[in-house]
Amino acid sequence: MRSQQPQNPDLGMKMGKPAPPAGPLKITFGDKSAEWTAATLAALPHKTITVYNEHAKANQTYSGVELIDLLKPLGVPEKPHGKEFRLYLVAEGSDGYQVVYSIGEVTPDVHDGTAIVADALEGKPIGETGPLQLVLTGEKRPARWVHNLVAIRVRVAE
């Protein structure tokens, strides 16, 4: 008798569908929130990173604002410890695509990688996958980068 393989659940993944135009980036943590437009982000200090994009089979250079610099004003700890490691982020693109990150994955004090909200690719504004994109160095799968980034929600695991 052959055992049946369980069916994969519908994860609601919407990859490959066209994304509606991205609006401002809204970041929330508890009752605090902030909105960032491409123009307001452009006025902040930028960091440039080079990552290998498995889909493009090439290194790509992105420039943007370090994510932790956008989270700190909302009270997200820059150097988490103890119970603060219960924090996680849900990043969402304008097409509804979502990726979950632990606070440790996006905090330079914990992780060797860098997380940026990128607004430039190869020195030019990000095209159809922008205007904003969440990019992390050290990620082996670009599917964990969020294109057309419109929301980041910081939550606490129970």
Where are these regions (language model features)?
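N-terminal intrinsically disordered, low-complexity segments enriched in P/E/S/T
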Residues: M1-E158
